[in-house]
């Protein structure tokens, strides 16, 4: 069985692909605004860890300054989000086999965002859910699970309202079934490049969050044993 955990965002979407709760792979999209030095660090990480995969995104298409229109803005959002979702889902598909029994676990929308930001992430999240249902699950909606952010934090032993850094600390202290995984080891070995004060740089925090979606399925199945 393969469980795909997804933490979707417009900036750094990430997925954890777990086979039989023993083997882990991660894939994450990297924003085009990433500095050259940090991109080089991520490229080195990828070269050293075959189970940590990054998709380096091209700059998004934008309207010419001073010529913005409402329709133009919405068209570009749709085009940019479609391209992002296509790349992300294609990357996930490249890491699973056609005969795999797949479960997809996705973090639900966090409503901390407001206004246009909430509208944008809701629109893009709907697109990635449909793409996963159509292209990965081949319409088998019963294999798609959506959990609230609080439920996923609880799965690793953090409070439902825990902040990102608290979740990171919990993961590093006790990663549960991901102990000795490439992600846990990589963060341990590269703390100076990944942690800045109490900020966990993307896409590593996003990759941790995607793992929580896998862990939630594992914990849920244990309840039926």
Residue spans for each PLM region:
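Phosphate- and other anionic-substrate recognition elements at nucleic-acid/protein interfaces
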Residues: 1-225
């Amino acid at each position: 069985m393969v469980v795909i955990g997804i933490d979707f965002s417009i900036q750094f979407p990430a997925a954890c692909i777990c086979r039989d709760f023993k083997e882990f792979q991660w894939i994450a999209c990297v924003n085009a605004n990433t500095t050259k030095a940090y991109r080089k660090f991520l490229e080195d990480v990828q070269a050293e860890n075959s189970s940590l995969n990054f998709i380096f995104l091209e700059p998004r298409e934008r309207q010419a300054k001073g010529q913005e229109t409402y329709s133009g803005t919405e068209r570009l959002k749709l085009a940019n989000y479609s391209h992002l979702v296509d790349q992300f889902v294609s990357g996930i598909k490249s890491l699973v086999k056609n005969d795999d029994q797949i479960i997809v676990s996705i973090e639900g929308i966090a409503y901390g965002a407001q206004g246009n930001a909430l509208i944008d992430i809701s629109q893009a999240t709907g697109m990635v859910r449909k793409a996963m249902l159509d292209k990965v699950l081949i319409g088998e909606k019963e294999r798609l699970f959506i959990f609230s952010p609080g439920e996923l934090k609880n799965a690793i032993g953090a409070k439902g309202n825990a902040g990102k850094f608290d979740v990171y600390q919990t993961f590093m202290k006790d990663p549960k079934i991901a102990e000795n995984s490439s992600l846990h080891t990589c963060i341990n070995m590269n703390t100076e490049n990944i942690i800045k004060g109490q900020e966990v740089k993307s896409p590593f925090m996003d990759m941790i969050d995607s793992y929580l979606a896998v862990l939630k399925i594992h914990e849920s199945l244990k309840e039926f044993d």
